[in-house]
Structures are given as C-alpha cells and as structure tokens.
Amino acid sequence: MRLEELKRLQNPLEQVNDGKYSFENHQLAMDAENNIEKYPLNLQPLESKVKIIQRAWREYLQRQEPLGKRSPSPPSVSSEKLSSSVSMNTFSDSSTPFARAPVGKIHPYISWRLQSPGDKLPGGRKVILLYLDQLARPTGFIHTLKEPQIERLGFLTLQ
C-alpha cells in the first residue's frame, strides 16, 4: 500500500465529499453503533419479562417452603408496614380472586385483610390480582405500568 492511500484510509475527513456535516453525521452514527454494542438494550416483550419474574418467584417460594413449615405463625403487626408500591397476587388455578387458600400461601396479610371485593387495604392501596398459569408474584415493574397496559396483560386491578 502506498503512503498516500494509507493516510486517506486513516483520515475519514478525506473520504467525505459533502464537507463537515456529513462527517459529523457519520461520526454520530458510529458513536450510536458503538454505544449499542457496549450497552445492549434489553428490548424483551413484557410477557417474557413476566415469565422471568414468575420463574424467580417460584424458585424463591420453593426455598421458603421449609421455613414456612417450621413456624406457622399468624401475620404480625409489623406486616401492616407494607411499602407504598402495588401489592400483587396470582393464583395457579382458575379460582375467583378472593379464594383465600392460594392468596394466604402467597401473602398472608392480603388474605387476612382482603376478604371480599369491597374490602380495601389500609391507605387505599391497590391490589392487582394476576391470572397466570403458575403461582407467581411479579414485583418491581408492575407499579410502573399504566392501567390499560395492566389490563392488556390480563391483570385485574381492584380499587
């Protein structure tokens, strides 16, 4: 390779015929590509995120079962200190949202305080009941969803 050709290939300004703006656009495009490669975006559909969270929750429940069998105590007074985020429950069967057995397994406080459709949690908190094929409790992202998105996923929101 000749020295002139090597310099031309190393300096992208000489390759751009349209002047400064074309080079800047090219540089911005290259920066964007490099950032995407360095920081891959997680663009999974919401349904697959729910499945990942379901799987993690099932594994957590399996680890907690031996602990629950050792100390079958009723919910304590400190369980009233729920976070201000949305509380959620799901059922593994096709039972009604207020079937007490599955809810009690997931969150004793909910089954203790929420006995019928008219009941509310302290502070007017919402409860989202999820109808999914497996016992699960998604947390961390549901509270960021808007009501239409939640309904699209088949979640029931109680006021």
Swiss-Prot record:
InterPro entries noted in UniProt: IQ_domain_protein, IQCJ-SCHIP1_N
Bias type Low complexity, positions: 76-87
PANTHER family: IQ DOMAIN-CONTAINING PROTEIN J
Region feature Disordered, mapped onto this chain: 63-88
Domain IQ span(s) in chain numbering: 47-67
Name recorded for this polypeptide: IQ domain-containing protein J
Residues annotated as transmembrane: none
UniProt-listed Pfam families: IQCJ-SCHIP1
